[in-house]
Amino acid sequence: MPAPHRLYPRSLICLAQALLAWALLAWAPAQASQELTLVGKAAVPDVEVALDGDDWRWLARKRVLTLGVYAPDIPPFDVTYGERYEGLTADYMAIIAHNLGMQAKVLRYPTREQALSALESGQIDLIGTVNGTDGRQQSLRLSVPYAADHPVIVMPIGARHVPASNLAGQRLAVDINYLPKETLARAYPQATLHYFPSSEQALAAVAYGQADVFIGDALTTSHLVSQSYFNDVRVVAPAHIATGGESFGVRADNTRLLRVVNAVLEAIPPSEHRSLIYRWGLGSSISLDFAHPAYSAREQQWMADHPVVKVAVLNLFAPFTLFRTDEQFGGISAAVLQLLQLRTGLDFEIIGVDTVEELIAKLRSGEADMAGALFVNSARESFLSFSRPYVRNGMVIVTRQDPDAPVDADHLDGRTVALVRNSAAIPLLQRRYPQAKVVTADNPSEAMLMVANGQADAVVQTQISASYYVNRYFAGKLRIASALDLPPAEIALATTRGQTELMSILNKALYSISNDELASIISRWRGSDGDPRTWYAYRNEIYLLIGLGLLSALLFLSWIVYLRRQIRQRKRAERALNDQLEFMRVLIDGTPNPIYVRDKEGRMLLCNDAYLDTFGVTADAVLGKTIPEANVVGDPALAREMHEFLLTRVAAEREPRFEDRDVTLHGRTRHVYQWTIPYGDSLGELKGIIGGWIDITERAELLRKLHDAKESADAANRAKTTFLATMSHEIRTPMNAIIGMLELALLRPTDQEPDRQSIQVAYDSARSLLELIGDILDIAKIEAGKFDLAPVRTALRVLPEGAIRVFDGLARQKGIELVLKTDIVGVDDVLIDPLRMKQVLSNLVGNAIKFTTEGQVVLAVTARPDGDAAHVQFSVSDTGCGISEADQRQLFKPFSQVGGSAEAGPAPGTGLGLSISRRLVELMGGTLVMRSAPGVGTTVSVDLRLTMVEKSVQAAPPAAATAATPSKPQVSLRVLVVDDHKPNLMLLRQQLDYLGQRVIAADSGEAALALWREHAFDVVITDCNMPGISGYELARRIRAAEAAPGYGRTRCILFGFTASAQMDEAQRCRAAGMDDCLFKPIGVDALRQRLNEAVARAALPTPPSPQAAAPATDDATPTAFSAESILALTQNDEALIRQLLEEVIRTNRADVDQLQKLHQQADWPKVSDMAHRLAGGARVVDAKAMIDTVLALEKKAQGQAGPSPEIDGLVRTLAAQSAALETQLRAWLEQRPHQDQP
């Protein structure tokens, strides 16, 4: 008992191993398979399947029928598209599954062997597309065939005739999965077998000359030939190998499945089999029925004695017989002969002739056994025998496409009709249309050409032939006019009367060809693209050949002369070539800079001595090598980088490269200018690269030093600018007190005239010193590139008039006549910076008066429109002492002066005016030119091109009234003044007192903040730079307090007050929360103007002063608008004034409300548009402050992408200005007298 106990585990292990091995064998093919979707015929027929009850019950239990297929496809049996499986086998599988009530499943395996293994292991139920020659058929049982399998022999078109019985010495191409090697070796022992993975590859090998003969089944061959190789190969004969047909294969032990499959296949009617064959286009490509007709013993003996039959055909009888340009015989008759070859086993040797007479002569002489295509003619039946006709076709009339050409047979009377000589239609046509004149031609092509050339009016030909020629060679020239009422022409084979056996064989074979096959052949050749050799088609080539022959003869004669000259010139050319080569060698080697030539792979072809000297190598070390191979740079990584640069960036892009590079060679870094140029041959193909470099290390070092020097000079210039600005601040602070006190002393009435004169002198001197500081700052700004112009709409006439008014008194004091000449045509308003233009004109006029002792100074202005712009010239001429050319060259340099006349002595001034003036004009895009000569005088011309602006529809501003004292503001404000400089604090307080303001002063930021918290102020004016709390900090604290919740006072106006002339000072003030910035020194009039502008913008609810509260008159001008503009615009029409102003008030109020809504929505483009609209209303009443605000808002909103505090402030300011404008307009209207409308 112990022994079985010990053996039990070992037996169990063995059993487990066996089961595992079986499972792995079963699993392996399943893993290699791919499940496909079966796509069968759309309409699957129902057939009567005779099965017993057991079979139906077995099928009901099985439910799924699995078909195995394998790669590669065998079209048309197996065709795979992605995961779809279709084809002839798929159609039959669909019929089987449908009629058995089964679900069909398809598994595809990579090879045939794997599919057969899957069948043996039970993974699949059956396999398709197998025949009786399969080498493994002992393990298979085959169903009844569902498709015929006739092996056929295929050869290239035009191949020499080889007996199909043995194929001796031929290379035989076969699909490895089609026929076993033993079967082919027995059938063709003298042939060399070549196996290919698929039938398509085997057939391609024959088509492209890699093999001589292909053997495959007729269905697959027909499909492949018709799809891809119709013009390359042809079926020449059947291969006498029995295959048994294409069947389904099942395991040998699965007899029940075999029985039910056979039951379905046998129940399929023949019509359905034909339908499936035709569904895959296999009914007409080649004959699929190779069953030979029943030949008699004498006929079989005749075929054995005459294996080759000579067939005479017309060279050009398209589309029945023709020879292509590749010398291959084709046409309808050729296809019919191919079918006959398959059914008889005879080989046909084609003999081409040009005419029917030659063809008949060949038959009578015995040189030909039969005619391939001939019209059946009763006259010829006396010596010829005709076969059954294989083409019957009606006769048609072909004419030119002319209006007078015959349109039908009734119009042939009196016309010339061309026919082929000895045509059967000639006697019929002459009997039917005796008035027609008949001319003959050798062949149909010549007859067509006679009509096309006008030698005949019409040609009578079969419809097939006529259509072929007209569509192919005479399109647009000839046309088929109509059918001819003659019996249809019949095309048949013909032999001499004694060839009875041959004619019987031909007739039996023809009768075995179905009408469908014949119709398919005719249909194919109706639209064939065969290229027959016709005189018409090739006459140009023939003419060309004749011309080439004559040209060749001429060239031959010329060649003799050429050779004699060539011999004489050769030595001269050799000497010239040697000279050129020597010149190129000297040119390249004599160049001091390295030059090299490389091929497209980067190998060195040529280099000069400078290249070799740079790296210290010989030519042998670099020629024929790439940069990494030669490694002359000493660094392998750098060598690879340079090699990649040449190949990828120059050779690949094919663009010249010029660049500076830093290269380290043998431990030394050199800066080189490198150039590389790709070059090619005459065809544009890249051949290599020409390159070189120039060592620019020293030049690069000089440039670096130059850059450092420039940076040092720029730093010194910036230090100078900062010094000048700082200096101006230090000078302006005490100057502010001096000028302000002097101005107040001059304004206050006094009886002490001598004191006033002294004060006037001191005031003028201080103003001159201030102008000096301004000039210094202007030149510093210009040199720093931070000088900005502010062009605005300006009336061009105002600019020279203002300069004349300023200098008129000075000119009268010196006894000089100051003249203004204007020649302004078509120009009104222009865009210009009026302040800077006045500065230029003032400098030029002032200099002219300064250096003129007698005579006159003329300011001339000329302006003409030039498109959208205006060409403007200002010219200042004097009769002074004049300036030499040497002095003129110095005048426009900063701080340069030249002496005046000998009597006048040295010229006063700083020497900055002319320099600044020229630079200002250049910034405006113009030129300033001086012309002068000693003793003659000087003329300075300024030429500008200015943008013109449409003239504003408003009245001109009234002339400024000349007053002894400036007017005071119309409101009394509570003002807090802050400055740590006592004189400036006292001055500003007295200026504000003079203007009628209520002033409280503080000498520090801390004191000012305390006073602001205790009292309500309308305006705060603070110095910017103070110890402790600066003006900027004071502004920030005030604005923070105003923004705090619960702040009940009105927001105050905050001015910065500074002597700094830095260009960004105003921005710094606004950034700190100030409304604006005042610059020291400031006069009383300027201070009044700034206060009035601030009051207008802020619309302070301060009660008016006694002066402002007085009843207004028509001459009074309100702060927010111009009454003069309104009166001029309305011609003082009271009704129109009220109507206009009411509309302005209403429109402005609605536009401001809409603007605020758009501002809340952050719709910046529409905000900009609304601001532009508000500007129009403001211009009507000349509301200058409001115009400035809306223009700034319009510009700022353009292109804005997000929130902007600056836009927020502009919108608030604009709303306040609009409210103030409305209040003042209504108050002005109330003061005006009411008039009844007429």
UniProtKB/Swiss-Prot annotation:
Matching Gene3D superfamilies: 1.10.287.130, 3.40.50.2300, Histidine kinase-like ATPase, C-terminal domain (3.30.565.10), HPT domain (1.20.120.160), PAS domain (3.30.450.20), Periplasmic binding protein-like II (3.40.190.10)
Alphabetical list of InterPro entries matching this protein: BvgS-like_periplasmic1, BvgS-like_periplasmic2, CheY-like_superfamily, HATPase_C_sf, His_kinase_dom, HisK_dim/P_dom, HisK_dim/P_sf, HPT_dom_sf
PAS domain location: 580-651
A UniProt-annotated Pfam family: HisKA
Localisation per UniProt entry: Cell inner membrane
Record topological domains on the Periplasmic side: 332-541
First and last residue of the signal peptide: 1-32
GO biological process per UniProt: regulation of DNA-templated transcription
Recorded catalytic activity of this chain's protein: ATP + protein L-histidine = ADP + protein N-phospho-L-histidine
Residue span, Histidine kinase domain: 726-948
Role: Member of the two-component regulatory system BvgS/BvgA. Phosphorylates BvgA via a four-step phosphorelay in response to environmental signals.
Protein name (database record): Virulence sensor protein BvgS
Gene this chain is encoded by: bvgS
